[in-house]
Curated annotation (Swiss-Prot):
It is found in: Cytoplasm. Belongs to the eukaryotic release factor 1 family. Keywords: Cytoplasm, Isopeptide bond, Methylation, Phosphoprotein, Protein biosynthesis, Ubl conjugation. InterPro entries: eFR1_2_sf, eRF1_1_Pelota, eRF1_1_sf, eRF1_2, eRF1_3, Peptide_chain-rel_eRF1/aRF1, Ribosomal_eL30-like_sf. The lineage of its organism: Eukaryota, Fungi, Dikarya, Ascomycota, Saccharomycotina. GO terms for cellular component: cytoplasm; cytoplasmic stress granule; cytosol; translation release factor complex. GO terms for biological process: cytoplasmic translational termination; DNA-templated transcription termination; sno(s)RNA transcription; translational termination. Component of the eRF1-eRF3-GTP ternary complex, composed of SUP45/eRF1, SUP35/eRF3 and GTP. Interacts with TPA1. This is Eukaryotic peptide chain release factor subunit 1. SMART domains: eRF1_1. Changing residue 180 to A: Abolished ability to mediate translation termination. Can recognize stop codons in ribosomal A-site, but is unable to catalyze peptidyl-tRNA hydrolysis. It comes from Saccharomyces cerevisiae (strain ATCC 204508 / S288c) (Baker's yeast). The modification Phosphoserine is found at residue 421.
């Protein structure tokens, strides 16, 4: 579970970075994109940058020449910080970008991908090339397929664009017997016994292929085939319950074997695409159930959610992936640290006023609340789930509940929480900075 949460956070970080990098533009060709695959040799790339520096010295435009040389130098300096290449490769972006107010700003990003990259790239342009990072974001979850008919069964997997046949075997099942009397009953018994043994073997081989070290190794399972075999397997007590609960689709195909596998992939494309969507819906349905049943084991809005985090009461922290709220750290007149929250474009700056003096407090730091939560959620014993607003439940969570909430370990009565000193998350005189329904 922790690995899954960590991976989702890495994906979210890359997604946010790609969004900001894609918007960046510069003058001339002074924005460098450098991608080094896992087996790349850092000294070779340093030599290439030295050669590029020599070539760039001949650029006629003085302004562009100086910008490009500066970007190459920044890239070289960043690369020197790496004695060894990270196991999944390295992506560097360096250069001068134009800010919203028309000024030039030097930026440098170094990204260690959360999974291996298979591309080598060096480009100087007026934009950063983020295609490699965008490819990382494409779903690479592995799904298992069991294609089962009267001739045999194929076990396969699909991950991204890769289709793999894991195992297949044939079976010789008796056909239905046309004669009547005792003979028909005996054949029916034999036939039923053979079918039962066939389902048993499929269930056993499924465990061998889709469970590793007592853990299911696929995101979901698709059962495919002609006739009733796939349904018999799904309903069978012989089918490992760890796999049974992973079945996301049962599809009818016209063939067995590899042709049936290909057809099953086509027919289940929508189910595969919707797995994350379905997971999000299930999470939010469980959250809304807590609210409708008034269990007290839920909260929403920034104030209550942060109180619950402080109490260690949060089991699952749920946050809209595009939450824009900023977390400000101030110092008041008595040198106390004060935490406040506001939208980035908030016109009302009263949240920054020191109540004791009426003066604006000094800003110590500011960062998106969502980034602070991603960095600190573990300290509160919680797990972190990012959601989108693409499902109806997600849209309701964002518009009706402020895009932040939690499922709690135990009931918390927020109305009875009385702070002994001025709470850093909540100001009773001013009320919340937010108006959540």
């Amino acid at each position: 579970m922790d690995n899954e949460v960590e991976k989702n956070i890495e994906i979210w970080k890359v997604k946010k970075l790609v969004q900001s990098l894609e918007k960046a533009r510069g003058n001339g060709t002074s924005m460098i994109s450098l991608v080094i695959p896992p087996k790349g040799q850092i000294p070779l790339y340093q030599k290439m940058l030295t050669d590029e520096y020599g070539t760039a010295s001949n650029i006629k435009s003085r302004v562009n020449r100086l910008s490009v040389l500066s970007a190459i130098t920044s890239t070289q300096q960043k690369l020197k910080l790496y004695n060894t290449l990270p196991k999944n490769g390295l992506v560097l972006y360096c250069g001068d970008i134009i800010t919203e107010d028309g000024k030039e700003k030097k930026v440098t990003f170094d990204i260690e991908p959360y999974k291996p990259i298979n591309t080598s790239l060096y480009l100087c342009d007026n934009k950063f090339h983020t295609e490699v990072l965008s490819e990382l974001l494409q779903a690479d979850d592995k799904f298992g397929f069991i294609v089962m008919d009267g001739q045999g069964t194929l076990f396969g997997s699909v991950s991204g664009n890769t289709r793999t046949v894991l195992h297949k075997f044939t079976v010789d099942l008796p056909k239905k017997h046309g004669r009547g009397g005792q003979s028909a009953l005996r054949f029916a018994r034999l036939r039923e016994e053979k079918r039962h043994n066939y389902v048993r073997k499929v269930a056993e081989v499924a465990v061998q292929n889709f469970i590793t070290n007592d853990k299911v190794n696929v995101k979901g399972l698709i059962l495919a085939g002609s006739a009733d075999f796939k349904t018999d397997l799904a309903k069978s007590e012989l089918f490992d319950p760890r796999l049974a609960c992973k079945v996301i689709s049962i599809v009818d195909v016209s063939y067995g074997g590899e042709n049936g596998f290909n057809q099953a992939i086509e027919l289940s494309a929508e189910a595969l695409a919707n797995v994350k969507y379905v997971q999000e819906k299930k999470l939010l349905e469980a959250y809304f159930d807590e609210i409708s049943q008034d269990t007290g084991k839920f909260c929403y809005g920034i104030d209550d959610t942060l109180k619950a985090l402080d109490l260690g009461a949060v089991e699952k922290l749920i946050v809209f992936e595009n939450l824009e709220t900023i977390r400000y750290t101030f110092k008041d007149a008595e040198d106390n640290e004060v935490i406040k929250f506001a939208e980035p474009e908030a016109k009302d700056k009263s949240f920054a006023i020191d109540k004791a003096t009426g003066q604006e407090m000094d800003v110590v730091s500011e960062e998106p609340l969502i980034e602070w939560l991603a960095a600190n959620y573990k300290n509160f014993g919680a797990t972190l789930e990012f959601i989108t607003d693409k499902s109806s439940e997600g849209a309701q969570f964002v518009t009706g509940f402020g895009g932040i909430g939690a499922m709690l370990r135990y009931k918390v009565n927020f109305e009875q929480l009385v702070d002994e000193s001025e709470d850093e998350y909540y100001d009773e005189d001013e009320g919340s900075d937010y108006d959540f329904i």
